[in-house]
Amino acid sequence: MADEIRTGTTPENTTDTTDGKAADATATTATSVTSSPSRRSVLGWGGAGLALGAVAAGGTAAALRTGDDAQPAAAAGDAMAFYGPHQAGIATPVQDRLHFAAFDVTTSDRAALIKVLQEWTAAAARMTAGHEVGSGAVGENDQLPPDDTGEALGLKPSRLTLTFGVGPGLFEKDGKDRFGLKSRRPQALVDLPGFPGDNLDAARSGGDLCVQACADDPQVAVHAIRNLARIGMGKVAIRWSQLGFGKTSSTTPDAQTPRNMMGFKDGTRNISGTDQAALDKHVWVSEKDGAGWMTGGSYLVARRIRMHIETWDRTSLQEQEDIFGRDKAEGAPVGKQKERDEPVLKAMKPDSHVRLAHPDSNSGATILRRGYSFTDGTDGLGRLDAGLFFIAYQRDVRDAFIPLQTNLARNDALNEYIQHVGSAIFAVPPGVRDSGDWWGKALFA
């Protein structure tokens, strides 16, 4: 049963054209893995169970194997490649839904932690390819808990990506070097400073490890985090998590720019996932940056930004546009006609968000944004708990997010309508190269 695949898939390269998704989906073809069959376990034929153990690949049957010596073959055209020089979920096309989880490592046993990371990697390779974890949701022994929780049965891969990172607490926590990694902490993995206006909730901040699950189907993303948490039970525990929807930035330039919960287009000038020069300059860690195990990786900053929705909704349109420095309908900068027209910063108010966030206002500081909107019900006063779950990737936070956020926190007119309530930083290692590699292997070498 381990190699059974779930059904419910669409023909390969099928895209959703709603709200500009088609461009992002089409862009996956360079990095996606394709194969012909559907992905649910095939049961039947006179009451007997039939496991689909091979698929046609280029006219040749290729057996699906579960061991460490084989990458699970993709079960549909919208499965993203798992192996590569960089982790997927950074520069790859942005999906519609997010489940982000930060974990505390509860064991002090180095070998036990390594085993969790190895099992996580194997499970991630299978789930991103559209397969069940281990022996599946209806495993071979019905007297034991199944290896897969089962809520993704019948769902297509939905371009699932799983992006793994390590936080400062993995290297030293409460003065203890639990895993002998203190000397391996990259200089760029700094503790973020306090910024003016921060009101951080410790329960929604920090973490020793993180996994960012992105997919076009929220249930696929939730299934991935749930199964990783189950695998790590007793060794790691979820510290906090966040669901997100309505991607607020795109890495695909020809995709329609998404809107945030304030109704404005968000991410117009984001780094393109196909601009290799910009990615090398601003996103990917190079060998000369130190910490060799991070070469090809990036640094992730996550910020939970709550919006004062009710106050914003009572603000005039003119004031809203002045605050952002763009018009609300088209997204054009002040004095321009089109969204992607080059902004004239001096034409904007000195405290406008676009002006203050522009690289020219921050000594060239540039980040790759990959955030999502969120709504988490209401607070005790009946106000909507909603906003932006901001995610940024960069080569070095000391040259990117920190100076950028310092400028915004001090001067941005938008601060009257938002508050940062959660924060975390993680070092995101390079991609898993092959089936013998695993998340964090070079760190523990």
Predicted regions and their residues:
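N-terminal secretory signal peptides
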Residues: 1-37
